[in-house]
Amino acid sequence: MDLTASLEDDQREKLRQYTEFTHQQDYEVAIGTLASLNWNLEQAIEAHLMQEDKNDDEDPEILETIPAAASGRNAGASSSSRFEPEVINIEDDEMPATRGRRRGRAVTPDETTTVDNQVKRLRIDDGSSSSSNGAATHHRGAAIPRQKRGQATEPTPSSSGSSSASFSSRRGTRANPVPPPNQEPAHPESARQNGGILASRHNNHNNQQNNHHHHHQRIPINPRRVDVFNVDSDEDDDSMAIAYEDDDDGVHEVHHSEVVARGSGPPNGRIPMIPDGFSSVSDALRNFVAIFSDRFCSTPQTQAFMPPFYTEPLPAAVKEAFDHPNSEHRRPLLFYINHDRSIAANIFASQVLCSETVSTLIRHQYVLFPWDITSDSNLMLFLEYLQAANMGDVRTIIQRLAMSKIESFPLMAIVVKERNSYRLVDYCRGTDTSDQVMEKLLSGVSEYSDIRMNEQSERREREEREAIRNQQEAEYKASLAADKARMEAKQQEIEEQRLEEERKLREEEEECVRRQTVASTVPEEPPASAPLAEIINVKFRLPEGGQDMRRFRRLESIQTLINYLSSKGYSPDKFKYFNSDFPKKEITRHFDLSHNFADTKWPAREQIFVEEI
C-alpha cells in the first residue's frame, strides 16, 4: 500500500527531505512524526536529533579513573597486575551542541602525582613517628624541667617557646614588682600604715640578701611596649617620643631600696591626699582638696589663689568640660597629678599652681581634675579611669613617668576634645616655671578655641545644609500635596460628571417610561375621512420652531390633548400650553381638563403654542 498516495505535493516533498536527512526508512513512522508536528520539517528533524542524543546518553558510561600510588618494590608488580579500563578521548569539537558532558578523559601524570601526595599526607604511622622522635625531643605536653635562677641554660628550639611563654607570665613592673626566689609574694597593705609592716619585710629581705654578692635583682618588666618620653628638666623641648621593643627577654635593673620605697607609706608621715580604700571618688577628691588647702592655702592670702579643683568623678568632669549645654562654657580639661615622693611636690604646688596668674587662668579657662598617685593602688585606679574614658595618651604618659621619672611630678596634662576623640595637647612638669606653665596653658586654650571655632563653623555649615535640605523637602512635599490636590479635584470632577451622566440617563429612562405610560392612555387618532362634525384639527407650535398636527374627537376630553403633548416629551411640569385667542389663554388654567372639546365649544381648527417654563 502506497502511504504517500494520499499526501499533497508539498507534504511528499517534506517527507522526502526528512527521510534523506534522518535516514528513516519506515515511512509510517516518518509520516506520523511530521503529522504530529503539523508538517514542520525543522521541528521534526530537531526532534529526531534529540531522540538520538537521548539514546546515546542511556549507553553505559566509561568513568575516568585515577590509579593508586605504588610504593617501594611492589610498584611495578601492582601496576602490571591492575586492570586498566579503556578511556575514550572525545575532543570538544566532536561533541554535539545538545550534549552537556564528556564521556571520559585520560588521567594526566600531574593528577596522579597530586593524588599520591594527598594519600601520603593522609597516612599516619603512629609507631614510626613516636619511635623516631621519642629519643631526641620531649613529647608535646611533657613537663620541662625548671632552671634555677642564675644557672646558664643552652636554649633549644623546643624549649625556647615554652620558656618565653612562662617568662612572660612572670612579668612585673615597678608598681607591682615580682618577688625574688624563696620569698612569698607580698600582699597589698594599706599605705596609711606609715610603712610599719613593709619596713619589717624590708629588714627580713635585707637579711636574706646578706649571703649574696649582688645588691641588685633582675626584675622582668612588661616588654610589649616601651615608651620613652623626653622629660629632662634641663631642656625646654617637651616633645614626646615613643619607642617599641619586641624583645620578650628584656629586664630592668631595680635596686631593692627603690622597690620597697614604692610600697611604703607617704614620706615624712604626711597624710595622703587620697587615702587607699576610699568609699567613693567624690569623697577622695574632697579629701584631696582639704589636704591641699591645708598644705598650701592655709592663710587668707593664699586661700584667694586656691585652685578650683573639680570634686566629681572623671565622667562628670569630662561632661562639664566638653559637653556643657551652653557651648560658650565649654573648656579644656586639665589634670593635676600629685606625687608626694617627688622633690617638686611642694615647690610646684605653692609657687606655680597657687600663683595668681596660673590659678586665675585655670579658674576661668579650664576644668581642673586632681588626683594623687603616691599609692600604687591609686595609680592603678587612675589608669583604669583614663582607660575607661578613652584617654590613652594621658594614660600612657602618666604610667611611664610614674615608673621612670617621679621627679617630673606634679604633672599637669592638657586634654582637648576634637571630633569626638580626646587628644593630649601638652603637659607641664614639676620642674617647669610659672612662665612655662602659663605659656603651655595659654597654648592649650588657644588650640581648643580654634577647635571650637572649627566645630562651630562645621556645625553652621551642617545646619545650613540641613536647612536647605529641609526646605527642599518641604517644597517637594508641598509640590506633592498640590499634585495630589489637583488629582483629587480632577477625580472629583470626573466623578461628578459620571454622576451627572448617570442622573441624566436615569431621568431619560424615567421620561421614556413616563411617555410610554402616558401614550398608552391617549386614544387613537381619528382617520382623516371622519366627518368634520365629529373631529377637530389642532396644530401645535413646538419650541425651537417645530410643528405637529393631530386630530381629536370632539367627545374626547381636553386631558387627551395634554396627554398627547406629554407623550411627545412636553410634560405640563416643564412646559405651558396657550391657545390662539387674544390675549392667549393657558389651557391648563382656563379650561377644565375633564370636559370634552364639544362642551368647551372648542373650534374646529385650533393652534396651540407650547412654551418652555
From Swiss-Prot:
Function in brief: Ubiquitin-binding protein which acts as an adapter for ATPase cdc-48.1 and/or cdc-48.2, conferring substrate specificity. Together with ubxn-1 and ubxn-2, plays a role in hermaphrodite spermatogenesis probably by promoting the degradation of sex determination terminal factor tra-1. During mitosis, ensures the degradation of DNA licensing factor cdt-1 and the disassembly of the DNA replication CMG helicase complex by promoting the dissociation from chromatin of several of its components including cdc-45 and sld-5.
Listed name of the protein: UBX domain-containing protein 3
Tissue: Expressed in the germline (at protein level). Expressed in spermatocytes but not in mature sperm (at protein level). Expressed in the spermatheca and nerve cells.
Organism expressing this protein natively: Caenorhabditis elegans
Matching CDD domains: UBX_UBXN3A (cd01771)
Record's compositionally biased regions (Basic residues): 137-149
Pfam families: FAF1 (PF21021), UBA_4 (PF14555), UBX (PF00789)
UniProt keyword annotations, A-Z: Chromosome, Coiled coil, Cytoplasm, Differentiation, Nucleus, Spermatogenesis
Main localization, broad class: nucleus
Annotated Low complexity bias: 68-82, 158-169
GO biological process: cell differentiation; ERAD pathway; masculinization of hermaphroditic germ-line; positive regulation of mitotic cell cycle, embryonic; positive regulation of protein catabolic process; regulation of protein localization to chromatin; spermatogenesis
